[in-house]
């Protein structure tokens, strides 16, 4: 399990403030809006917003926001608080989450995770400028049900950054680790070596131990497919089905092992059948990391 923090040079409205949120609501500011500038000053971090507010006080401010593919200008009157003027929203710069490490190359210090990209509020691939990785552990499990995806809820462990992220792609998130991981090296499988039939996935569901669980590879799609859906999987392990109901959020990146070789990673769950999901070929992840 690994914690991921991807950052970029955009500032997004994450939530309304419970007390002062009416200022933002009445101005038409919406969750998911990207703040481009305030009073003509470019915004690339939350501090840029605070700087203008502290300078102009309670005077109305003009916000240019990107909503989808359109730019909109909003007039907003900040509310005065004991900590200075506020526009009534919580701002987010980048995205945080958890996933599972798929592979680690000790010679290069390189690792890959998720097997799919991280998207911004508009659904587009997040244009990451920098990022950090942290050790993380599972604190609770929300079991998946048909129509209601489950989730591994995790939190960061330790006090420092464990690695640095350098690339967010449709085939996964990649970085370099400062410390590395212990484990047994396994060969990777070429596309032509992967077969339908029994396989194993490795993931951390409870406690701090990574365990293997049985799955079935039901279908293999063309190698050229780049959306992280190269394999159709079905969870067959009774222990995993009991614990999670199948594939859940937070398991993205879980390595898929077949005949002693790393063939890919778990990427998606079928919402209407959490026992089934998709995986990506390891070859596609390694190509994206190169």
Where are each of the predicted segments found?
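Second-shell loop/turn segments in exported
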Residues: 18-21, 36-40, 87-88, 187
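Extracytoplasmic/secreted envelope proteins and their assembly/folding machinery
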Residues: 10, 29, 46-53, 98, ...
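Serine endopeptidase catalytic core focused on the charge-relay Asp
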Residues: 80-245, 249, 258-259, 267, ...
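Short, surface-exposed secondary-structure edge patches
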Residues: 24-28, 51-54, 191-192, 244-247, ...
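PDZ domains, with a preference for the canonical peptide-binding region formed by the helix
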Residues: 37-70, 273-275, 279-283
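Conserved PDZ fold ligand-binding element
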Residues: 24-47, 256-259, 263-267
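PDZ/PDZ-like groove recognition
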Residues: 2-31
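PDZ-domain C-terminal substructure recognizer with occasional recognition of PDZ-binding tails
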Residues: 2, 30, 50-89
């Amino acid at each position: 399990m690994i914690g991921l923090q991807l950052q970029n040079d955009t500032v997004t409205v994450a939530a309304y403030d419970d007390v002062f949120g009416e200022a933002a609501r009445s101005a038409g500011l919406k969750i998911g809006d990207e703040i481009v500038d305030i009073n003509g000053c470019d915004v690339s971090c939350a501090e840029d917003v605070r700087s203008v507010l502290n300078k102009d006080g309670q005077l109305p401010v003009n916000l240019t926001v990107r909503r989808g593919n359109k730019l909109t200008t909003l007039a907003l009157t900040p509310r005065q608080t004991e900590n200075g003027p506020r526009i009534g929203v919580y701002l987010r710069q980048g995205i945080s989450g958890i996933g599972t490490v798929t592979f680690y190359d000790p010679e290069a210090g390189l690792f890959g995770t998720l097997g799919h990209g991280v998207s911004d509020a508009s659904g587009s691939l997040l244009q990451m400028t920098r990022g950090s990785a942290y050790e993380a552990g599972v604190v609770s499990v929300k079991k998946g049900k048909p129509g209601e995806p489950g989730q591994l809820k995790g939190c960061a462990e330790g006090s420092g950054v464990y690695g640095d992220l350098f690339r967010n792609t449709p085939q996964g998130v990649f970085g370099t680790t400062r410390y590395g991981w212990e484990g047994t090296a396994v060969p990777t499988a070429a596309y032509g070596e992967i077969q339908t039939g029994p396989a194993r996935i490795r993931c951390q569901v409870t406690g701090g131990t990574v365990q293997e669980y049985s799955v079935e590879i039901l279908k293999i799609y063309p190698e050229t497919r780049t959306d992280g859906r190269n394999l159709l999987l079905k969870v067959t392990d009774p222990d995993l089905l009991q614990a999670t109901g199948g594939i859940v959020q937070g398991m993205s990146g879980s390595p898929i092992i077949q005949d002693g070789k790393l063939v890919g990673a778990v990427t998606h769950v079928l919402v209407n059948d959490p026992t089934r999901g998709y995986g990506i070929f390891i070859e596609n992840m390694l190509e994206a990391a190169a």
